[in-house]
């Protein structure tokens, strides 16, 4: 039995998710989306994770909707890079740090 639906992979917010979200909602399934935040999220979501990317920065409306942030840590400068671009403390939601998997053996990333 499905307990939650997570929409992720590529960039899900480039699609109009209204109909999908509606169909999931009438089945009482919670909906979680993970997005870079650069495109408007069309459709009602229960949880929004913003994982920002340099090539497509999050738009303000999505920063306000975020339930959490996921920052990919590629090297020792990654955290400072993103804190210079986004005021995570002011937004006030959890921020998770994830090592970039190709760098996961690099202790400076951990």
Where in the sequence are the language-model features?
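Glycine/small-residue-rich loop that forms an oxyanion/phosphate-binding "nest" at active or ligand-binding sites
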Residues: 1-7
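Conserved AdoMet/S-adenosylmethionine-binding subsite of the radical SAM
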Residues: 4, 13-110
